[in-house]
């Protein structure tokens, strides 16, 4: 049963990350004709296409993709808790799972971008999209801390900021008195 839970949880998280990538790519105005962008659109289009006719976009945010990502996070919470209930704690857990997945996605994009910058040297279409994704997040840090000696420290600063936010959210959840949510947050 734990193997099935792990497998289902992983598949849900991966598809949620692809949905979040789609939202992020639209927000960052990534090159739509890039092969990686086309992959993300083709993987998500069967579910998002019909929903977009019913659910309009909220400015630069693709609300249909965000809704499906939240529903998948809610399903992941049910899978992790191994209980089918619609109590508010499960809805909150779904939101926390979605927020944690956003943080993990940012971390992985930064890590893969850094590794690819050492290996591919700008020839990969994936690297081009990752740079387009990370640039809006790194630009404010680069304004405060420009590259020193040709080394850009902004990705490391952003990863450190993600860790601080992660610990801060855990402390806030612990202060609520509910022991389930901080444990869930740290276990994800």
Swiss-Prot record:
Location in or out of the cell: Cell membrane
Transmembrane segments: 1-21, 67-87, 89-109, 145-165, 168-188
Highest taxon above the source species: Bacteria
Record's keyword terms, sorted: Cell membrane, Membrane, Transmembrane, Transmembrane helix
Single GO BP term: cellular hyperosmotic response
InterPro entries linked to this entry: CCB3/YggT
GO cellular component, one term: plasma membrane
Topology with respect to the bilayer: Multi-pass membrane protein
Family, as annotated: Belongs to the YggT family.
Protein name (record): Uncharacterized protein YggT
Species of provenance: Escherichia coli (strain K12)
Gene that encodes it: yggT
């Amino acid at each position: 049963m734990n193997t099935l839970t792990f497998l289902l949880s992983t598949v849900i998280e991966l598809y949620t990350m692809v949905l979040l990538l789609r939202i992020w790519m639209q927000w960052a105005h990534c090159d739509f004709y890039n092969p990686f962008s086309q992959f993300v659109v083709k993987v998500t289009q069967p579910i998002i296409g019909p929903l977009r006719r019913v659910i309009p976009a909220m400015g630069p945010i693709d609300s249909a993709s965000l809704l499906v990502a939240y529903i998948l996070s809610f399903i992941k919470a049910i899978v992790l808790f191994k209980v089918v209930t619609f109590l508010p704690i499960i809805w909150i857990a779904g939101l926390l799972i979605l927020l944690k997945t956003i943080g993990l996605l940012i971390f992985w994009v930064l890590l893969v971008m850094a590794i690819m910058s050492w290996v591919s040297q700008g020839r990969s279409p994936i690297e081009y999209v990752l740079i387009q994704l990370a640039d809006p997040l790194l630009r404010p840090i680069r304004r405060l801390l420009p590259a020193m000696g040709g080394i850009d420290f902004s990705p490391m600063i952003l990863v450190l900021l993600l860790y601080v936010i992660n610990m801060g959210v855990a402390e806030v959840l612990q202060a609520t008195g509910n022991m389930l949510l901080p444990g869930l947050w740290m276990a994800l």
